[in-house]
C-alpha cells in the first residue's frame, strides 16, 4: 500500500531497505523524494491517510509543516520523504546499507 501511494503521488527515487536483523525499531525503511516542500508534505499526508484507512494504529509523523524531511513511523515500516538536497545530505541509504546490498529501488 505504501509503495502504491508513493507512486500515485509521483514520489521519486523510492528505495526500500530491509532492516530485519539490523534494527529493533522497524522491519523496513522506505526512502523517497518529493520535488518541493509542498510535494513532500502532500506525499507524507497521503501515505499517512492510507495507513489509517487500512487500520494501522499509532502512526507518528514528524517534520510537518516544514516539510524538508517528513518521517512517518507506522511501527513495522518507517517512511522518510525528503526534498532532494536534504536526502542527498543525510544519505540514509548509505548509512543503512553500507556493508550489504539490502536497498532496492522500486
Task: Describe the role of every protein-language-model region.
Residues 1-21, 38-42, 49, 54, ...:
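Long, contiguous binding/interaction regions
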Residues 20, 26-29:
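Short beta-strand segments
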Residues 28, 68-70:
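Short beta-strand micro-motifs in enzyme catalytic cores
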Residues 31-33:
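Short hydrophobic/aromatic beta-strand micro-patches
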Residues 72-74:
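Active-site beta-strand termini and strand-to-loop segments that position acidic
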